[in-house]
């Protein structure tokens, strides 16, 4: 007997899932077919909607996952073309950077292009604004980005900044927090919820770097509006982009790309490329252009590897069907 209503994945710990239902929380596992018949990226993640079959007061088996929408992915570490699902049914992604040595505008770009790829609204959250930092330098670095996405300066020690961030979350919206370790994602979630719902830790005094507090993705409900998903800090965030050409539309070179002679200009060595002209004349910072080339190369590499992977899977499926047909005709 399947439970008729849809249930949402709140948390995943290895092969165990915590499912939120109208009847409370259930600890669930996957059926064998789901666990071994799917790639890691296809397994349920936080935010996914599923149907499950209860077999105890608070335990059950997940038997079906509904089609996904607005799922944020990243490239799985140590692989060429495998991807990992971070969260599903996401409306906004808070890209959190701290205003200390962690701040890196190139890293912000990396998160931003992946978030936009999935039709999720990016929001830049510059946390720990109570620290002593060069505000003018930061604003100059994010000038182009801030023309495209909202930017918030926040600190848990400055309540008015938390209030402004909370007001940006509409009722019913799901927000995922992404960023490096130690930028204060869990502390921000606690501040937005006005209570301690997630564990937090201090910055290491010896290294000045954050410790991993969140070890898994976890969903929490705000008191009066949205749903927040905290994620572990990441040391690397590999791109999962099908069309590398789309990068030029969201990065800083987009202002110049519109003037290129050819609409399909890739801004590498094409004649009449306005981007290259801007770089050569010094109008466009070479660091910005180099970042575009790096992200494009990475996106192209994944896209090509993914295409080859699908091609092999299609050939294997065809081979299996041929074997089945031969057996059936004996």
Where are these regions (language model features)?
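Short, small-residue-biased leader/transition segments that mark boundaries at the very start
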Residues: 2-8
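Short aromatic-glycine-enriched beta-strand elements
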Residues: 15-19
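Beta-strand/loop nucleic-acid-binding surfaces
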Residues: 25-42
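Helix-rich effector regions associated with P-loop NTPase G domains
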Residues: 39-56, 67-86, 92, 121-122, ...
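Phosphate-binding glycine-rich loops and their immediate beta-loop-alpha structural context
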Residues: 86-91, 95-147
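Canonical P-loop GTPase G-domain recognition
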Residues: 131-183
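Walker A/P-loop
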Residues: 186
